Amino acid sequence: MEYMTDPVKHTPGHILCCDCGVPISPNPANICVACLRSKVDISQGIPKQVSISFCKQCQRYFQPPGTWVQCALESRDLLALCLKKIKAPLSKVRLVDASFVWTEPHSKRLKVKLTIQKEVMNGAILQQVFVVDYVVQPQMCGDCHRVEAKDFWKAVVQVRQKTLHKKTFYYLEQLILKYGMHQNTLRIKEIHDGLDFYYSSKQHAQKMVEFLQCTVPTRYKASQRLISQDIHSNTYNYKSTFSVEIVPICKDNVVCLSPKLAQSLGNMNQICVCIRVTSVIHLIDPNTLQVADIDGNTFWSHPFNSLCHPKQLEEFIVMECSIVQDIKRSAGAGMISKKHTLGEVWVQKTSEMNTDKQYFCRTHLGHLLNPGDLVLGFDLVNCNLNDEHVNKMKSDRVPDVVLIKKSYDRTRRQRRRNWKLKELARDRENTDTDDERQYQDFLEDLEEDEAIRKNVNIYRDSTIPVESDTDDEGAPRISLAEMLEDLHISQDATGGEGESMMT
């Protein structure tokens, strides 16, 4: 007979705590958890209350040593910012977990629950959970302080153009709106010959200068002025100024090129018409339809001026018009415009209809003009031309009249215009009485030139009924397909998430 015995079950033994005598499982310290916590506090040295700075103007928190960051409540960025405030004490323990404890948004308190571990007596690892209270203290950041002190800008971009017309500035304004280059500006100030853009950082101003160089022919100079300095920390506070000069040529200007420049452009005639100003100056020779593009560097190397200003435009009536079929081209001639037609016309001033004085000229508007049409142009015969290049030209090389564009009834065009443009919010120093007429000229240029229209956001005006693309006079109009709807977003699509802590 064999005796069956139950298998021996090995159970861990118990020992008595060396302090209180309570039976416990063996551990390296031979002390119960309660006694160990009473003797050792692993959170010692970690502050339980910390202050954190918050700017209520811009809703940003201060991150040492000198930056301000924007963080939403109970976000990971804000938690990282809070832990950095106690980074040195936390380096002595092992951080296991960290999370926010909910507080009222207006309580100016942030509570963070931390779980830490640390090796204590004889290799025993103790874990502890505690809460750090962050007191939010209001403090105005440096940027907001400068705003309140009216000394908030650090860089300014001064854009200037020495012309009597603002067509280039109106075009530049639309490009700035289209690409959102005005979003970082603190203030935009309009003066009589340009615009000033104020920025809170030099980097934003440099970005604006680069944008201007890509859109219009310019040159610029940079300077800076020392405002304050700290010799102990070796820090300096500068104000930077970027002076940007746009070429003094606008659309519909008649210019006279230097002989050297005209020869380098394909033996063009020196008298040319500016048909467009974008990133380069687009010129056309009204006698041969030869076109040329002049960039900023070429212009400043061989500068030229406008012979007449827009107020000198005179109205002519077309008496006779014929198309030139065979265009003679000299050796080395440049490109010929395919969008224009060369014509020979006889015109007479509308102010001299009681006389029989007529003028003969060649024009690039042969595809638009018919006998009886009204056209705007410059009378170079009876005009006092004070230009060094014109004075050196032979009289037979200077045309009597240079026609610029066909004339339409402006009142009717304004009444039928069913589109509009947006404008920059800016401070106006002086309002010129001629600004409205110049703005209407720019709107007419948009209707007549499709190439410029492509770079501009045009919005449909719902108050004006939609009509055909051309009116009874044949004046060009912008089609509905080229217009955008003017949208107004009145509510925040993201809802209330990430709202500011203080109001």
UniProtKB/Swiss-Prot annotation:
Pfam family, one: NMD3
Subcellular location: Cytoplasm; Nucleus
Molecular function via GO: ribosomal large subunit binding
CC per GO annotation: cytoplasm; nucleus
Record PTM N-acetylmethionine, positions in chain: 1
Locus of motif Nuclear export signal: 480-489
Spans annotated as Necessary for the nuclear export of the 60S ribosomal subunit: 425-503
Keywords, comma-separated and alphabetical: Acetylation, Cytoplasm, Nucleus, Phosphoprotein, Protein transport, Transport
Residue span of motif Nuclear and nucleolar localization signal: 405-422
GO biological process: protein transport; ribosomal large subunit export from nucleus
Residues carrying Phosphoserine: 258, 468
In-chain residues carrying the UniProt-annotated modification Phosphothreonine: 433, 470
Role description: Acts as an adapter for the XPO1/CRM1-mediated export of the 60S ribosomal subunit.
Oligomeric form and interacting partners: Found in a 60S ribosomal subunit export complex with RAN and XPO1. Interacts with XPO1. Associates with pre-60S ribosomal particles.
Family (UniProt): Belongs to the NMD3 family.
Record PANTHER family: 60S RIBOSOMAL EXPORT PROTEIN NMD3 (PTHR12746:SF2), NONSENSE-MEDIATED MRNA DECAY PROTEIN 3 (PTHR12746)
Protein name as it appears in the record: 60S ribosomal export protein NMD3
Organism listed in the record: Bos taurus (Bovine)
High-level lineage: Eukaryota, Metazoa, Chordata, Craniata, Vertebrata
